[in-house]
Amino acid sequence: MIFTLGINHHSAPLAIRERVAFGADKLPHALADLTRERPVREVAILSTCNRTEIYCSAESPDVVIDWLAHYHQVGREEIAPYIYTHDQPEAIRHAFRVASGLDSMVIGEPQILGQMKDAVRAAEENGTLGTQLHKLFQRSFSVAKEVRSTTAIGANIVSMAAAGVHLAERIFESIAGQRILFIGAGEMIELCAAHFCAGKPKQVTIANRTLERGRALAEQYGGTAIRLDELGEHLAQHDIVVSCTASPLPIIGLGMVERAIKTRRHRPIFMVDLAVPRDIEEEVGELDDVFLYTVDDLAQVVESGLESRQAAVVEAEDIIANRVKDFLGWLESRDTVPVIRSLRDSAERMRRHEIEHAMKLLAKGEAPEKVLEHLSHRLTNKFLHAPTQTLNSAEGGERADLQGAAARLFHLHAAD
């Protein structure tokens, strides 16, 4: 049975989501820990700014919920009210919707597809991706491609990066003339840098754990790079701060920002924290001269382009409904695999035995035509012995059922 369980921006606030997030470097250990000594056969973990989801093949989701709470050292009762669980067929539909961007904060955004592929790659590399989940995700990627190529779901999207620019322009008349500090150098920061730098800021600085990666991004926009441990020295020089790292703990604290505000003589700082868990301490937003926005704060802005895409959403849901039916058909066909494998193994044993017998006859000088005739008769009798015996011994309704099954299995047609 395929299950999906998780917490996302629909079900839980940021304060809860950040407590159960998984950094990319933690996934190998988490995957191994979940499948160790637990009745979980397959598992993949998708963890982004807006969701932490566990896709698994298991008997029940309860053991996974217990593990999630234990792994993150939180009480089950603290997170249980925010957790949603889906079994078949809803788990399949949910995976297809997530991959297609229908469950995202920004409806139709394409980044989630890459994030899901990363989650699948991590599961595959760590040996927790089996036949069912592999097929589920490959179908999810195929459905996402179909949705994007046949509907307008990706049109008129207001991205998180564009929303950040929109909010900044409420504080400052324009981006031009402002000094911007980007913290991190991942995909989200790259997107934000492209949007903000289109406004021709006065200065661009990239702060990153590895200076080389920071420099590579900074050079694209004529900026400079600094290390994360230099943030305290440089924060006061910037008017706009956009942060998105994978740090498990905040990297900008209240004290650091208070000192920066004092140095700036209370000129405002606009800050966007796109990280989960948060990069900037929540208390920073209470300072008078700081305008701090999180991923949840940007939700209303990114919804602005959704109305024009409602027709595309309906079309996408129809596509997904049909593909869910197809996948359920594949799952049902998997139920017959053990029987088919056993049937073929039995036939193969018979074949090998009769081939050995025939080879011995040929070695004794028997005529090949006679040996082939003998071989074909013996194979026919062996293959049909068990079903014939079962049909002959059946009675009443069982016999009628078996006769019908035999006719279907062997494509038999009754004589006129």
UniProtKB/Swiss-Prot annotation:
Note: During catalysis, the active site Cys acts as a nucleophile attacking the alpha-carbonyl group of tRNA-bound glutamate with the formation of a thioester intermediate between enzyme and glutamate, and the concomitant release of tRNA(Glu). The thioester intermediate is finally reduced by direct hydride transfer from NADPH, to form the product GSA.
EC number, as in UniProt: 1.2.1.70
Membrane-crossing segments per the record: none
GO biological process per UniProt: protoporphyrinogen IX biosynthetic process from glutamate
UniProt function note: Catalyzes the NADPH-dependent reduction of glutamyl-tRNA(Glu) to glutamate 1-semialdehyde (GSA).
Protein family (similarity comment): Belongs to the glutamyl-tRNA reductase family.
Gene: hemA
Classification via InterPro entries: 4pyrrol_synth_GluRdtase, 4pyrrol_synth_GluRdtase_dimer, 4pyrrol_synth_GluRdtase_N, GluRdtase_CS, GluRdtase_dimer_dom_sf, GluRdtase_N_sf, NAD(P)-bd_dom_sf, Shikm_DH/Glu-tRNA_Rdtase
Class of the enzyme per the UniProt entry, highest EC level: oxidoreductase
Residues bound to substrate: 48-51, 104, 109-111, 115
Pfam families, alphabetized: GlutR_dimer, GlutR_N, Shikimate_DH
Keyword Transferase: no
Residues at the active site: 49 (nucleophile)
Site (Important for activity): 94
One function term, GO molecular function aspect: glutamyl-tRNA reductase activity
Reaction it catalyzes: (S)-4-amino-5-oxopentanoate + tRNA(Glu) + NADP(+) = L-glutamyl-tRNA(Glu) + NADPH + H(+)
Domain comment, as recorded: Possesses an unusual extended V-shaped dimeric structure with each monomer consisting of three distinct domains arranged along a curved 'spinal' alpha-helix. The N-terminal catalytic domain specifically recognizes the glutamate moiety of the substrate. The second domain is the NADPH-binding domain, and the third C-terminal domain is responsible for dimerization.
Associated pathway: Porphyrin-containing compound metabolism; protoporphyrin-IX biosynthesis; 5-aminolevulinate from L-glutamyl-tRNA(Glu): step 1/2
Name of this chain's protein: Glutamyl-tRNA reductase
Keyword annotations: NADP, Oxidoreductase, Porphyrin biosynthesis
Positions of NADP(+) binding: 184-189
SUPFAM superfamilies: Glutamyl tRNA-reductase catalytic, N-terminal domain (SSF69742), Glutamyl tRNA-reductase dimerization domain (SSF69075), NAD(P)-binding Rossmann-fold domains (SSF51735)
Quaternary structure and partners: Homodimer.
PROSITE patterns membership: GLUTR
